[in-house]
Curated annotation (Swiss-Prot):
SUPFAM superfamilies: FMN-binding split barrel (SSF50475)
Protein name in the entry: Pyridoxine/pyridoxamine 5'-phosphate oxidase
GO biological process: pyridoxine biosynthetic process
One GO MF term: FMN binding
InterPro entries for this protein: Pyridox_Oxase, Pyridox_Oxase_CS, Pyridox_Oxase_N, Pyridoxamine_oxidase_dimer_C, Split_barrel_FMN-bd
Family per similarity comment: Belongs to the pyridoxamine 5'-phosphate oxidase family.
Cofactors named for this entry: FMN
Gene designation: pdxH
E.C. number(s) listed in UniProt: 1.4.3.5
HAMAP family linked: PdxH (MF_01629)
EC class of the enzyme, as a word: oxidoreductase
A Pfam short name: PNP_phzG_C
Length: 212
């Protein structure tokens, strides 16, 4: 076994206090996202998306957040992918934004709802053409005999759609994650980290401090 126990550091970038928190977690998320972008973090919109299969086995993967508002968080994917198949059977989902250089994490739990075709199309047409073509090429999560198969399919579809617009594939869509809870974590000195969790209620949001 490889021992990694001596890899550690102190967290020194500041704390988080209840008096600083807005009543709406999405306002704090927006503030933190803007700070992550301003700090020029690599892929500040990257989030770890966790879903569960029918046997209760969790799966995780990195996906890019494409939009957020007071309703929740939006991402897009192939509807034949493992994550989409699992969400069809169990819509419970969790998201994690790991902003390590800022010593911050945001963890979300909630329910994933499929987006309408109109909402998906509105985003799809903004993608670069090669990305639109790639959506047609990859049967996400299926097994491939070789990378050359994928590349050949891409060139075939690129030729097919060379003259005009790329249509939205019927098997490509997106989800709105409606949050049930959002936890904000800020690293603290001596491992006394600051954690606050917002939990959705009928009246709005409850806010509680959690032990680190």
């Amino acid at each position: 076994m490889t021992d990694l126990s001596d890899i550690r550091r102190e967290y020194t970038k500041g704390g988080l206090r209840r008096s600083e928190l807005p009543e709406d977690p999405m306002a704090l998320f927006e503030r933190w996202m803007e700070q992550a972008k301003a700090a020029e973090l690599t892929d500040p919109t990257a989030m770890c998306v966790a879903t569960v299969d029918e046997l209760g086995q969790p799966y995780q993967r990195i996906v890019l957040l494409k939009r957020f508002d007071e309703q929740g968080f939006v991402f897009f994917t192939n509807l034949g992918s493992r994550k989409a198949t699992q969400l069809k059977h169990n819509a419970h989902i969790s998201l994690l934004f790991p902003w390590h250089p800022l010593e911050r994490q945001v963890a979300v739990t909630g329910i994933a709802e499929p987006l309408s075709t109109a909402e998906v199309l509105k985003y799809f047409v903004t993608r670069p053409k090669d990305s639109q073509i790639a959506a047609w090429v990859s049967a996400q999560s299926s097994k491939l005999s070789a990378r050359q198969v994928l590349e050949a399919k891409f060139m075939e579809m690129k030729q097919k759609f060379s003259a005009g617009e790329v249509p939205l594939p019927s098997f490509w869509g997106g989800y709105l994650v409606r949050p049930a809870s959002i936890e904000f974590w800020q690293g603290g000195e001596h491992r006394l980290h600051d954690r606050f969790i917002y939990e959705k209620t009928a009246a709005g949001w409850d806010i509680e401090r959690l032990a680190p």
